Amino acid sequence: MSVAASFPKHTSFTMRASFAAADGLPETENNAGEPENTYILRPVFQQRFRPSVVKDCIHAVLKEELANAEYSPEEMPQLTKHLSENIKDKLKEMGFDRYKMVVQVVIGEQRGEGVFMAARCFWDADTDNCTHDVFMNDSLFCVVAAFGCFYY
């Protein structure tokens, strides 16, 4: 029995879509009711992902959150998630419009061993970028990588 045979002959499917904003485009805080241009292929210079500024932001968050932290295997999954969400929220506040932010956080126990990490991305070298920062104390190490990919 085929899939088509399982439906009555007169069955029709209807799809409805509604949009709150004019012309079906999402409203943003900057345009207050005007649709955002969807044909922008490059970010404005002031809104480009700037690795040095992002690294400073990451460093400040890590210093604040992990200054007195002790490594505990039971608590690290929650701390990792909290740090990644906190950093991503801070980056969104920095005004990188139309950028998709990806934040990767790795926390491990400090035992004097070496760790090697790598990332591979397929992106537009003119608009997309990344940065990373490392935090260490006597108990743990934390590596954060932030990727900013322009959304066309």
UniProtKB/Swiss-Prot annotation:
Protein localization: Dynein axonemal particle
Q: Name one GO molecular function term.
A: dynein intermediate chain binding
Predominant subcellular localization, coarse grouping = other
Decide whether keyword Cytoplasm is in the record.
yes
Give the stretches traversing the membrane: none
The record's listing under Pfam families reads: Tctex-1
Quote the cellular component terms of the Gene Ontology held in the record. Answer: cilium; cytoplasm; cytoplasmic dynein complex; dynein axonemal particle
Q: Which InterPro entries match?
A: Tctex-1-like (IPR005334), Tctex-1-like_sf (IPR038586)
- Keyword set for this entry? Cytoplasm
* GO annotation (BP), single: microtubule-based movement
Provide the assembly information.
Answer: Light chain of the cytoplasmic dynein complex 2, a multisubunit complex composed at least of eleven different proteins. The cytoplasmic dynein 2 complex consists of two catalytic heavy chains (HCs) and a number of non-catalytic subunits presented by intermediate chains (ICs), light intermediate chains (LICs) and light chains (LCs).
Name the protein family. Answer: Belongs to the dynein light chain Tctex-type family.
Q: What does this protein do?
A: Acts as one of several non-catalytic accessory components of the cytoplasmic dynein 2 complex (dynein-2 complex), a motor protein complex that drives the movement of cargos along microtubules within cilia and flagella in concert with the intraflagellar transport (IFT) system. Required for proper retrograde ciliary transport.
Recorded protein name is Dynein light chain Tctex-type protein 2B
In which organism is this protein found? Answer: Bos taurus
